[in-house]
Amino acid sequence: DQPIGSQATTYLLSVVMPVVCWYTGIQPPSFFYYETMKIFLDTADTQLIQDGYNTGLIDGITTNPTLIMKSGRDPEEVYQELIDMGLRDVSMEVVGNRKEMYEEGMRLSNKFGKYATIKVPCTPDGLAVCKELSRQLIRVNVTLIFSVTQAILSAKAGATYVSPFVGRVDDNSFGGLCLIKDIANTYAKQNWKRTEILAASIRGVRDVGRAFEYGANICTIPPKVFNGMYNHILTDKGLELFDNDWKSVQKLGA
């Protein structure tokens, strides 16, 4: 058995700290890492997000300029609606040069507070902004990750999340899921626990399971893929069998 002091420490780190970090929206301290399988929705369609959020299984949202454009709405109206819905982690992408991204990131962080994760590209300017924001305990999601070296630089810049693009890597004849595995192995061998791997550009249900298997901490997926995670032909057959048997039982008792 663990000594009482050790038990108390374990309880603090495994139970109390995750609750505090989740409620306040702050990044855990460097010595602590609470690993879990989190699912984000990758969309700016608030109706689809509401449907997903109502399941109780969605942990956050990722957006980008393309998704916002498709929604046809003002981005900050979308962000506010998501926060009002109850979502506590919304990735808000900034664009421009270093100064423009930093100023916009600070403005969004000041406006939306602990609910905002500022999304920057993996470029010299983007990582410089990541460094500046993370020093102020602002969550940063570094996007457009296509290599382990980019994930290393992003981690050193203080990224909360790195977003490897699984589907786009596959499109270019490379192994997108293998990239997840390589980043996870690199972080593990270096005992790096401050940056979570957020698998992005996921296009199929099977890839969600494989991404988690290969070491992703989070998968951000389109609503269609999320809904497809429930489905399996054997589940349907089993339900049909149970339904027919239950009807037979009811007839016996009639």
Functional labels for PLM-detected ranges:
Residues E81-D89, L127-Q136, C178-R194, N244-D245:
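Alpha-helix-loop-beta-strand connector modules within alpha/beta enzyme cores
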Residues L48-G52, E104, T149-K156, R203-A216:
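Catalytic cores of alpha/beta
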Residues F40-D42, K70, S91-N97, Y115-T123, ...:
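Catalytic beta/alpha-barrel core
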Residues P65-I68, V162-N172, N217-T235:
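Glycine-rich phosphate-binding active-site loops on the catalytic face of alpha/beta enzymes
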Residues L57-G60, L87, F112-K114, E132-V140, ...:
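Glycine-enriched alpha-helix->loop->beta-strand junction motifs that scaffold or abut catalytic
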Residues G228-L252:
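C-terminal helical cap(s) of enzyme catalytic domains, especially alpha/beta-barrels
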Residues F40-L41, D45-I49, T55, T63-E132:
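Active-site beta->alpha loop and helix N-cap motifs at the rims of alpha/beta catalytic domains
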Residues N64, I118, S154, A211, ...:
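Conserved, mostly hydrophobic/aromatic
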